[in-house]
Amino acid sequence: MSKRKSISTHDKSTKRARPVEEEEDSEDADDRDQDVERLSPQVLPSGDVSDVGIVKSITLNNFMCHANLGPFAFGSNVNFIVGKNGSGKSAILTGLIVALGGNAQATNRGSSLKGFVKEGESFAVVSITLNNIGKDAYKPEVYGQAIVIDQKITREGIRTYKLKSQSGHIISTKKEDLVTILDYYNIQVNNPVTILTQEMSKYFLHSKGGAEKYKFFMKATQLEQMKDDFVHIKSTKSVTVDKVEQHSECLKDLKRDYLEKEDRYKSLASVNEMYTKLEELKKQMAWALVGEVEKEFEPMKEKLESDRCATNKFNEKVDEWKKKVEVAEGKQKQSHEQLEEITQQVSELQSKCTEFKTEVQRRNADLKSCEVTVHRHKAILRDLEKDKAQLSSKINDLSLSISQATGAESQARMERIAQIEAALEDLTHHTSTLGQQIEQYQHSYRHAIEGQGKMKRELEGLQKSIDANRRQLQSMESSRSNRLQRFGDQMPALLAAIDEAHKKGQFKHRPRGPLGYLISLKDPELALSIEICLKNLVQAFTCDNYDDERVLKSLMTKVLQHGRRPAIITSRFFPKVHDVSVRAVNHPDYPSVLQALEIEDPVVANCLIDQRAIECILLIKNRTEARRVMQGRNPPQNCTSAFSVEGDQIFTNRSYTADQTRANFLSKDVEEGIRHLKREMETQKVQAAHIQQQIRSTDKNISENQDLLRRTQTEQKTTEVKTMKLQLELTDLKNVEEPQSEDLAELKSAFENAEQEYKQHKQLIDTAAEEADVKKVETKLTPLFTSLSCNILWVHCLFVLLQEELSKTDQEVMKCKHHEKHYEERRNAHLCSIKTLENNVASKEKELQESIAKAKEICPEQLVVRRTARSLDVEITRLKVKIATQREHQGDREEIVREYHEALESYANKAQQIKNLNNFIKCLDRVMDQRLYAYTVLRRFLSARCKYYFDSMLAQRGFTGNMTFDHKNETLSISVQPGQGNKADLNDMRCLSGGERSFSTVCFVLSLWPITEAPFRCLDEFDVYMDMANRRNTQRQSGLKMATSQKIRQLIFLTPQSMSSLPECRRIHIVQLNDPVHGQTQMEQEEEGP
C-alpha cells in the first residue's frame, strides 16, 4: 500500500516565494491587496453557495498507477488541486470523468477502460460523493444529503455502478439512474468547458486556426449537438421523402390489385346476401330455441312464487286452528272442572237430603204420636163425659174411619209407584234409543265432513288442472304460427328481454333455452317418449355461469309474472359436444335419445347429456319388445333405461307406466293436441260440475244431520230431566210410612178405665199439648228438606246442562284438532311440492341459462323471434343448398372475400401511411424552420455573451482584445494586445508569447463558463506554458475573481504550480497532493504530462 496523500490548505506563513518571482510579487502586491479587500466584503454564508450537484469528495483505488488516492474533500466554491507531476492530479480528473459515466476516449488517456486498472490488480474502484443539499435536491427522502457513486472496473474492461445513499445503502445499480441524476444536475461530462482535460487544453492551446476555436465554442455551448440534430433530421427527412415517393409508386399497384379484387367481390353480392340472411336465420334460430325454454320456465317460476306466498296462508290457518284447539281445550277443561264441582255438590246434597229425610220422618212420627196422644186424651175425656152408648158408637165410627182411610191411601200410593216405574222404564229405553241416534248422527256428520274435504281437494286439483290446460291451450293455439308459444305465452317476451340484455353486455354468454325449442325429432312418433324422458328439461334454460343465472332470474321475474317459471341449469359452455363414445349405449336396432334428436347447438346437447344422460337411454316403440330387451338375460351395455312409444319407462328390474298420454311441446301435430286438450277440458269441467253437485248435496246432508243431532240432544236432556223427577218422586213415595191403626181393644180398655183415669188424663192432656207444640216447631225442617230437594233437582239440571256443554266442547276440540291436522297435512304437502318445484325451477333456470349462453355464442344480442324453430330450420337448409349451388359456379367465396379484404386493407393502410408521412414532413418543415430561427438567435446571443465576458477578463489584466465570430464559415478569430488599446494595435494570438497565449486561452475558456450551465467546472493544468507574471494574474483571475463572480458554482483547478500567491479566503480550498514515491517509473511520471 502506498502512503496516503496529505490534504491541506495553503498557509501563507509557511510559503516561500521563489527568487525569480520577488520582483513580480512586489509589483503586484498592491493589486493583490485590493483584490482581497474586494473579496472580503462579498464573502457570503455557506447557505448562499449552491450545494446541489457539486463534488464533495473522491476516492481512487487501484486506478491507473495509484494503489490508493484519497479521499479528497472539496470546497463548495474554488478548489485548487496542487501537486507535482506523477502525484495523481490527472488521475483524479480521469477518475471523475469515468465515475460520471464518461468513456475512455473522453479522458484522452486511453482507448479502453481496462487500461485504467493498475498493473497486477484485478479491478479498480472510483468513488465520488455528490452534495444533495437544498431545495433542488434529487430525491432527498431516498438518498439523503449526499449521493455516493461507486464504479468498479474489471481487468476485462467491464464496469458496474452502485448508487448509494448518504447512509451507505445501495439504491440502484443501473447506469440509467446515473444518467438521470446527471441530467437532473445538468452535469455534462463530455463538455470541455465543464471538464477541460490536459490533452484538450494542449490541443486548444496549440490550435492556430479559427475553425478549431469555433468548434470548441460550439461544443462548449452544446450548439454543435443542436446542429448535428438538425443535420440528422434533414437527412432523415430526405430518406423519408424518398420512401414516400417509393410508396406512392407501390400504392398505384395496390390500387390496381384492389380494384380487380373488388370486381370479383361485387360479383358475390347475391351470395353475400344469402350468407347474411343465413347468419341472421341462425341467430334467430338460436334465440327461438331460447324462447321455447323461457316459455317453459316462466310458468314454473310463477307457480313457485305463488306457492311461496300461499305458504303464509297455510301457516296462518294452522296457527289459527292451533289457537282454536287451545281455546276449546281450555273450555273443555273448565267444563270438566265445573262438572266435577257439580257432581261433588250433588253428592253432598244427596247425603244431606237423605239425612234430612230420615230426620223429618222421625220427627213427623214423633209429632203424630204426640197429636194422637192429645186427641186420645181429649177423646177419652169427652168419651168419659158421655155415656157409654155414645162412646161405643164413637169407637165404632173411629175404627171404621181408620180402616177406610188407611186402605185408600195405600192403594193410591201403590198405583202411583207402579205408574212411575213403568214411566221410568219407558224413559230409560227412550234415552238409550236417543243416545244411539246421537252417536249415529255424529258419525254421519264426521263422515260427511271428511267426504266434503276430500271432494273440495279433488275439485281444487281439477280446477288447477283446468287452468293449466287452459293456459296450455292458449299457448298451443298461439303456437300455430309460432312454436315458441307452446312453452308459454310470455316466452317470446322473455327471449326478447334476454336479447336486449345481451346487447347491453349484461350476459357473459347468451343463455340457451327453452331446450325443447332448440331440438328437433328425427322420428315424430317418439315425441311423447322423448318428452317424458326429458321431463322439465324441455322447458329449462341453461347458463354458462352464476352471474348470467342471476341476470336471467331477474329477467324472468320481470317478464314471467304468472305461472311456473322454467328451471335454470348453470353449467360451463363448451364449443364442442362431449365425447360419449365410451359410455354411450349403441344398439343395432334401436336408437338412443341422443341419436333420435337433431341438435345443432353443442351447448344444448351437452346440457341434455349432463342432466339426463340421453346417450344411455334407448327408445323402443313396442312396450313388450322393450321389456324383452331390458329385462332379458343380457341387457344392452351402458343402457340405464328404455322408453316405449307410449312413454312407459322400463328398467332391468322394474317398469313404470306413464300418466301423460300425448306430447305437449315436441309434437308436430298442433291441431290434434288442441282437440285433445279441449276434450280433456270438457271432461274435467263435467267432473268438476259433478263434484260441485256432490258437495252441495253433502252440505245439505251435513245441515240436516246437525239439526237432527241438535233436536235429539235436546230431547235427550228433557227425557233425563223427566227421569230424574220421577226417580225423586218414586223415592219419596217409597219412603212414606203407612199410619198404624189403633188397637181397639186398648181403646175399649181405656174407655172402661176412662172414668178412673179422668184426672190423670186431664194432666196428661196438658203435658201432651205442650209436647205437641214442641214437635210442631221441630217439624218445620220439612220446608228445608223441600228446599234441599229443589236444590238437588236444580243442581242435577245444571249437571245435565254441563254434560251437554262438555259434549259440545268435546266435539269442538275434536273438530278443531281435525282441522288442525287437516291444514298441517296440507301445509306439509304444500312445502314438499314447493321443494320439488324449487328443484324443478332451478333445473329449468339452469337449462334456460345454458340455452341463452349458447344463443349468445351465436348472436350476442338478443333477438325477438316470432317464427318457429322448425320453419327457421327448413329455411336454413334451403339457403345452404342454394349457397352450395352458387359456390360451385363462382368458386370459393371465402377465398374471394379474404383476398378482397386483404387488398382493401393493404391499400388503405398504405394510403394512410403515405398521408401520415406527408403530414409529418409538412409539420417537420414548419418545426425545423422555427427551431432553426431559434437556433440562430441563441447562437447570436451566446456569441455576444462570450465576447462580453472575454473582453472583461482581458481588461482585468490590462489586455485588450477582439473576438470575431464568422458563423457562415464557422470560424472564430481572437486578437489580443498585451498593452492598452490606444497604445498598440491588436495582434493575433499566434504573435503572442506562450504565457500570454496560455493566459488568453484561459480567459477564453473562463468566458464560456457563464454561458454553460453546470454545478461544477474543472480545468487541468490551466497555467501551463505561462510565465510567473501571467500565472499570478491567472491565479488571481481564476481564484479571487471566480470566487467572487462564480460563487454559486464549484470550480476545480489542477496545477503543478504553487498557489502561494493566493490570499487566504474561505471560498478558496487548496488540495495539496503528496509528492510521488521515489523510484516511480517513467510511465507513472508521464501520466501527468509536462
UniProtKB/Swiss-Prot annotation:
Top-rank taxon: Eukaryota
Main subcellular localisation: nucleus
Cross-referenced PANTHER family: SI:DKEY-119F1.1 (PTHR19306:SF7), STRUCTURAL MAINTENANCE OF CHROMOSOMES 5,6 SMC5, SMC6 (PTHR19306)
Subunit structure, as described in the record: Forms a heterodimer with smc5. Component of the SMC5-SMC6 complex which consists at least of smc5, smc6, nsmce2, nsmce1 and nsmce4a.
Record's compositionally biased regions (Basic and acidic residues): 8-20
Residues that hold ATP according to the record: 83-90
Pfam family, one: SMC_N
Protein source organism: Takifugu rubripes (Japanese pufferfish)
Region of interest: Flexible hinge: 480-667
Gene name, Swiss-Prot/TrEMBL: smc6
Acidic residues: compositionally biased ranges: 21-34
Subcellular location: Nucleus; Chromosome; Chromosome, Telomere
A cellular component annotation (GO) from this entry: PML body
Entry keywords, A to Z: ATP-binding, Chromosome, Coiled coil, DNA damage, DNA recombination, DNA repair, Nucleotide-binding, Nucleus, Telomere
Protein name: Structural maintenance of chromosomes protein 6
Organism phylogeny: Eukaryota, Metazoa, Chordata, Craniata, Vertebrata
